[in-house]
Amino acid sequence: MKRLEVSNQAKLPTQFGEFCIQCFREKGSSGSKDHLVVFTPNFSQNPLVRLHSECLTGDALGSQKCDCGGALQMALERISKEGGLVIYLRQEGRGIGLFNKVNAYALQDKGYDTIQANEMIGFKDDERDYSIAGEILEYYRIKKMRLLTNNPKKIAALEKYAEVTRESLIVCANEHNQGYLEVKKLKMGHLL
């Protein structure tokens, strides 16, 4: 835990149920970044885990261009019933940040897919780093989990820290995100 500062725990009542929250401040050469863990008080030794990267447009604004907000809501609903945690990483736009994400959205409006748009503004298809999530899992002493994901990169990253069983999390396609979901499946290998 050399690069993490950990906050106190607090209660968080939500529309999905009662949770606790705890913040993890990641310290790095370019400053600090705060990540949030939302969890049920007494989760099992094989909890449901959702590793979720921040998506302001989907999570807070209800964007239909992606499946992020729906995936987060589905995860919170399941976790409130079955026990577990959401590790909410501050990695907006698959790690490119909000400013660059909006620029990528503008390119998508012109017909480019999500990967092409990222590459056109100088980024890889996915710039995220999940190692901080591994440190968070170690903090909670999680050695085995049921990971709510369709992303094989998340599975591979977390298998370094714990035994992972994948549970799918399918958000229905709509007219705005159908192409995005197809790109995630065909070009990024998502298990949709």
Curated annotation (Swiss-Prot):
What is the superkingdom listed in this entry's lineage? Bacteria
An annotated Gene Ontology molecular function = zinc ion binding
Disulfide-linked positions = none
Catalysed reactions, as listed in the record: GTP + 4 H2O = 2,5-diamino-6-hydroxy-4-(5-phosphoribosylamino)-pyrimidine + formate + 2 phosphate + 3 H(+)
Question: Per the UniProt entry, what are the Gene Ontology biological process annotations, in alphabetical order?
Answer: riboflavin biosynthetic process
For this chain's record, the cofactor binding note is: Binds 1 zinc ion per subunit.
The first-level EC class reads hydrolase
What Gene3D superfamilies would the database entry show?
Answer: GTP cyclohydrolase II
Query: Which keywords appear in this protein's UniProt record, sorted alphabetically?
Result: GTP-binding, Hydrolase, Metal-binding, Nucleotide-binding, Riboflavin biosynthesis, Zinc
What are its cofactors? Zn(2+)
* EC nos: 3.5.4.25
Q: Where does GTP bind?
A: R50, L51, H52, S53, E54, E92, G93, R94, T114, T149, K154
Similarity section: Belongs to the GTP cyclohydrolase II family.
- Protein name (Swiss-Prot/TrEMBL): GTP cyclohydrolase-2
Naturally occurring in which organism (per UniProt) = Helicobacter pylori (strain HPAG1)
